[in-house]
Amino acid sequence: MLLPWLILIPFIGGFLCWQTERFGVKVPRWIALVTMGLTLALSLQLWLQGGYSLTQSAGIPQWQSEFDMPWIPRFGISIHLAIDGLSLLMVVLTGLLGVLAVLCSWKEIEKYQGFFHLNLMWILGGVIGVFLAIDMFLFFFFWEMMLVPMYFLIALWGHKASDGKTRITAATKFFIYTQASGLVMLIAIQALVFVHYNATGVWTFNYEELLNTPMSNGVEYLLMLGFFIAFAVKMPVVPLHGWLPDAHSQAPTAGSVDLAGILLKTAAYGLLRFSLPLFPNASAEFAPIGMWVGVFGIFYGAWMAFAQTDIKRLIAYTSVADMGFVLIAIYTGSQLAYQGAVIQMIAHGLSAAGLFILCGQLYERIHTRDMRMMGGLWSKMKWLPALSLFFAVATLGMPGTGNFVGEFMILFGSFQVVPVITVISTFGLVFASVYSLAMLHRAYFGKAKSQIASQELPGMSLRELFMILLLVVLLVLLGFYPQPILDTSHSAIGNIQQWFVNSVTTTRP
């Protein structure tokens, strides 16, 4: 019975935030904080109950816990939620970043406190819904539902210095991209249901039953493309990434934390959970294309990041590069690479969130995000530059941080399958170090390039320090002791890989 509450708590909490705004500015913030804390506590409780440290995957049932309630029985649509190791990790990450998102917007947001927190909570509720839903219709419902609050978040509380027009443009761009891709996925879902109905005479949107749908190769390929396009826009895969830098550079800090940390992960999760098991043969045929697109994404993201002057746009492009690695891993079909992808997703969520929070704090102090205006900040502030250094080296995959474990496992697992692609993408890591260090150099070292950067600036408050140090500790823990994560996702990843590999062995020459 815990599962529906994981989704309901953020929705109810968001509604309360919106209604209690009249009692004072502080009330919505505290309600939001308590709400996200509860969600995080619930997800951790589920993790402790799951008994994931037993590594043999044979005896464990597929879902740790399920919730099934008929919704539109005539078409076989039900409110069907289930959780396994993979979705559990994602939900825990969502809860954690939710708490941080509330904390980092504590001082930043002045107008419409209640409505802001309503949108923030509803995004998080929608994301948790995406991770838990295994009814395809419900999945699509949550997938589209994340959009609207995110649109408001960017359009109403966007970047202060820019005039209203640009942030509304960015929000609209984000909305149109994701909406159009969602429609493609809706068509694919409906087509899949029709194919299943023609084969069996049963209307169902249930993921477990749709897994066994018999279909011809051409149909399967088309449906797989429908799903892939929807996930590729969210992930973002390179030709479809146009919304990401704009959305990030205009969104408030909390919005950026959610976008980078969680919304991008829904796409990778969708590919792993739905694309591969539902259309294994088509995915196997498509795999080389998918992997080359990932390689292209790594290099493109790195080069574009190097060229940016706006520090938030730079970080946005780093996440394009990071998700390129995940894309390569997803299409290798190797268990090791899948495990690496899960760790990479979590580590990237933490490190990108850290960078965006630091950006927000930097902006609150010097009121610019243009790196041409910074420089020489290292001696002007306590703590902040050094912590930026940590997150920058974490992003480029420094051993001892979680990002290294993820990237290493991805490259190691892919090497057995596609050595050429792996060797090429390893060079992407070199470019990663180039843009991270360039960012640090432009912002914190050298001469002060403007008036603002030359005076003494306030250090970090306790709240700011707490958020960042929490992320630092988690990243280092993940880097030195990733075993709990690996154990948790082991059986879920094993199932997905089983579906994928069995079909590959039968189709590939």
Language model region names:
Residues M1-I9, I83-T94, F137-P149, E220-F231, ...:
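Structural signature of hydrophobic alpha-helical transmembrane segments
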Residues M1-L2, L16-L118, A199, T204, ...:
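Transmembrane helix-loop-helix hairpins at membrane boundaries of multipass inner-membrane proteins
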Residues P4-Q19, V34-L46, V91-S105, I123-L124, ...:
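Central hydrophobic cores of alpha-helical transmembrane segments in multi-pass inner-membrane proteins
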Residues G14-Q19, L44, V102-L103, G125-G129, ...:
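Alpha-helical transmembrane segments of multipass membrane proteins
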Residues F15-R22, G98-E110, F152-T166, M235-S249, ...:
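C-terminal ends of transmembrane helices
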Residues F23-V25, L118, W122, G126-M215, ...:
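Alpha-helical multi-pass transmembrane bundles of energy-transducing inner-membrane proteins
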Residues G50-I77, D163-A171, G182-H241, L271, ...:
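Juxtamembrane/interfacial segments at transmembrane-helix boundaries in multi-pass membrane proteins
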Residues V238, A352-L355, T422-E456:
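Predominantly late transmembrane helices and immediately cytosolic-facing juxtamembrane segments
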